[in-house]
Design a protein with these regions (language model features):
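Short linear sequence motif anchored by a di-proline
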Residues: 1-202
Length: 202
């Protein structure tokens, strides 16, 4: 699974910075960053930190969003608080089946750029955190799903997201050995070539 991450300004601004639009980057720093919890050296999803995501509707300019997807059909704050601890991650194998993710999997995809993520190794009844990052330390692009939820009690709007996970590879199988989970998991990491394809599947 993926519940703990590190996210710096530089990582979160990767896609906008690549476009070379300095005015846009400045606008993000001035008008969006203050509404996030960045920079994050160790964020736990269960604390529902606020990050930047790049959505299929705005692929080059980020959106402020809270970790823990809240589907559009959630009726009130009580239901919202119950569901978003269960939607921090979305199993890639079932995103088109689960009611919480079906709509987003078809229409609302996003990318989250991070410096790395933490996974815990279990040994002798203790857990040991491992920090996973790229060898070149460049930002990691994670596949995500997002949703806009309108609070019917206040009419307030909130963007939320979930990180898509997949079966752990050989390396992650050695690290992510939680006995309570069936098989190792890891976030779905996108290559540069896969980013646009993820946002706009055919």
């Amino acid at each position: 699974m993926c519940y703990d991450i590190k996210a710096s300004y530089e990582a979160q601004l990767k896609r906008a910075s690549q476009k070379g639009d300095l005015a846009a980057v400045e606008e993000i720093l001035d008008n969006l960053i203050p509404f996030t919890d960045l920079p994050i050296h160790h964020a736990c999803g269960f604390c529902h930190p606020v990050l930047l995501i790049y959505t299929n509707e705005s692929p080059d300019f980020p959106t402020v969003a809270t970790w823990g997807l809240v589907p559009h059909w959630v009726k009130d704050e009580e239901q919202q608080k119950k569901i978003w601890n269960n939607t921090l991650n979305a199993r890639g194998e079932t995103i088109f089946e689960k009611p919480s993710f079906r709509q987003a999997a078809k229409n609302n995809r996003c990318i989250i750029y991070i410096d790395g993520f933490y996974e815990h190794h279990h040994f002798n009844k203790k857990t040991y955190p491992f920090f996973i990052q790229r060898k070149d330390k460049n930002p990691i692009a994670l596949a995500g799903l997002w949703s806009e939820w309108i609070n019917p009690e206040t009419n307030g709007r909130m963007n939320t997201f979930s990180i898509v996970t997949t079966e752990g590879n050989f390396l992650m199988a050695k690290i992510h050995n939680n006995p309570k989970i069936k098989g190792p998991r890891m976030p779905l990491i996108l290559s540069d070539e896969q980013e646009d394809e993820w946002l706009n599947p055919t």
